[in-house]
Amino acid sequence: MANPRSNRKKVKKQVVDAVAHIHASFNNTIVTITDRQGNALSWATAGGSGFRGSRKSTPFAAQVASERAATAAAEYGVKNVDVLVKGPGPGRESAVRALNAAGFRVQSITDATPVPHNGCRPPKKRRV
């Protein structure tokens, strides 16, 4: 006999304050929206949003990825967002603007780009 409780919908927890982690590398942009404890609510990438190759690293691709993560996080009732930006990529600015345009109140923007104290040797300079 079937389990009588199988038709119950899973209730999504309501999170009002969230943290948007934006990892903007030179090749891609990853947007993850978490609660204050760091549990992921939603995420999106520029590559997963339909952009491939060099189009992944554009500001528009970062904007689309940010919008997709924002719509998924809105189902959890997210209203206020602290933004944590990491990396030197071209999608930094546009991803933050897209979160603001999605209806979230951006409370703070923090740059958490890791800066080496002369650690690993950087990649060689490009000769085009």
Curated annotation (Swiss-Prot):
Example GO BP: translation
Protein origin, superkingdom: Bacteria
Annotated GO CC locations: ribonucleoprotein complex; ribosome
Record keywords, A-Z: Ribonucleoprotein, Ribosomal protein, RNA-binding, rRNA-binding
InterPro entries, per the entry: Ribosomal_uS11, Ribosomal_uS11_bac-type, Ribosomal_uS11_CS, Ribosomal_uS11_sf
Pfam families membership: Ribosomal_S11
The UniProt record lists the keyword Cell division: no
GO MF terms, alphabetically ordered: rRNA binding; structural constituent of ribosome
Classification via SUPFAM superfamilies: Translational machinery components
Family listed: Belongs to the universal ribosomal protein uS11 family.
Record-linked NCBIfam families: PRK05309.1, uS11_bact
Quaternary data: Part of the 30S ribosomal subunit. Interacts with proteins S7 and S18. Binds to IF-3.
Protein role: Located on the platform of the 30S subunit, it bridges several disparate RNA helices of the 16S rRNA. Forms part of the Shine-Dalgarno cleft in the 70S ribosome.
Name listed for the protein in its UniProt record: Small ribosomal subunit protein uS11
Species this protein is from: Chromohalobacter salexigens (strain ATCC BAA-138 / DSM 3043 / CIP 106854 / NCIMB 13768 / 1H11)
Lineage of the species this protein comes from: Bacteria, Pseudomonadati, Pseudomonadota, Gammaproteobacteria, Oceanospirillales
